[in-house]
Amino acid sequence: MNQSEVEIVIITGMSGAGKSVAVRSFEDLGYYCIDNLPPVLLPKFIELIEGGIDKVTKVALVMDLRGQSFFDELFKAIDELNETPASRLKIQILYLDAKDSKLVQRYKETRRTHPLAKGGLPLEGIQKERNLLEEIKGRAQQIIDTTELKPLQLREKIMQRFAGNDRQAFAVHFVSFGFKYGIPIDADLVFDVRFLPNPHYVEDLRPKTGLQTEVSSYVLKWKETKQFVEKLTDLFDFMLPHYKREGKSQVVIGIGCTGGQHRSVTLAEYFCAHYEAKYDAYTSHRDINKRKANSR
């Protein structure tokens, strides 16, 4: 980040998806944090920031749902700021999401009432909120699915994505998963590798994962795997620079096999190793331990 540049992260998303954890994480990263700033005040706040108030260079703003007009004002403010030629601001939206069933579970556990729920039925409020937030989710530069994340894991993910913003301008996140458990909702691109030879049918490899050499060597040795890797590398080499040029701060690439244990893990690790010298590349393996957990 340039010394004169001011980074502003707008934190929003579904109620119960982890915004409170997120803002505490940004505070620990040294961001100047404000909770529930009305969008109508955003331009005035930015004016103070650009005037050099307290020499603030990193800001995180939490903006919750207050109705459609609330976000109309937010979009208008962001568009006006982005159209200012001399602006030294870097504004991005971080959207926190989770599956409806997980949000319902969290509301039941905390015994809180959803702000849009009538009669205390959280699912009704969640569905209304999801519809209202559809546009802002579409404009978000970063989306984090917190369905399977504990608070500490969400904190670690935010730290991983934002701690290095002063040194890295573009991150590539390769996430392996199993199609039987659903597609990651925060993935920008999804690739299906279920056509590759499956180590699950090799008795010695079945209990192992793609993090182990025996499995990765098996997956990568096949002609079809080598051809696929070559073609996908060509695609990534073409697409990633364009994503970066368009101002996207991160691309999440989902690679899925049946259970998320062997093939997808192998290829996520392969591509991460291939691109880590060029980009801020990292991996996560969403479903790598689910088969073991389900067999207990």
Swiss-Prot record:
Molecular function terms, GO-annotated: ATP binding; GTP binding
InterPro entries membership: P-loop_NTPase (IPR027417), RapZ-like (IPR005337), RapZ-like_N (IPR053930), RapZ_C (IPR053931)
Phylogenetic lineage: Bacteria, Bacillati, Bacillota, Bacilli, Bacillales
Record: residues binding ATP: G13, M14, S15, G16, A17, G18, K19, S20
Species in which this protein is naturally found: Shouchella clausii (strain KSM-K16) (Alkalihalobacillus clausii)
Recorded family membership: Belongs to the RapZ-like family.
Keyword rRNA-binding: no
Record-given protein name: Nucleotide-binding protein ABC3036
Top-level taxon of the source organism: Bacteria
